[in-house]
């Protein structure tokens, strides 16, 4: 993101677009998991790249992340990041399996389930943004990575670093209704 100021009004518009996108993504995920979910109102902010890892627990925190590029009239990427415990719970719900306390790694099926969840969420999100803004956007197949947050962020930061030193963050929190 280029070094430019976003006005309060622009942030409000982005928050509303994020809210609608997150709502549609929540509906899609609820149907997929046959579970009631809700979403908190998204927090929209512009962060320097070195601040993003701290937002998700610090550079040494192990996370699961699904990355998707989108192209069209504008281009960019989305990153769906989960703490390891959240990722374990989501994969377990989708695959109807439980993980022991000694859990240390995801197998191929676990990663596939998380990648599919991320794909559905981000496709719903990007589709909503496309509809609301009348921008033609298409989404590429997702990639998944389970690693330390600093490592997970290295690819997006290296790509985005060519055009700026900040990223627009729409932080959506999905919560179980139970």
Question: Which residues fall in each region the model found?
Answer:
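Composition-driven recognition of glycine/serine/threonine/acidic- and proline-rich low-complexity segments
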Residues: 2-178
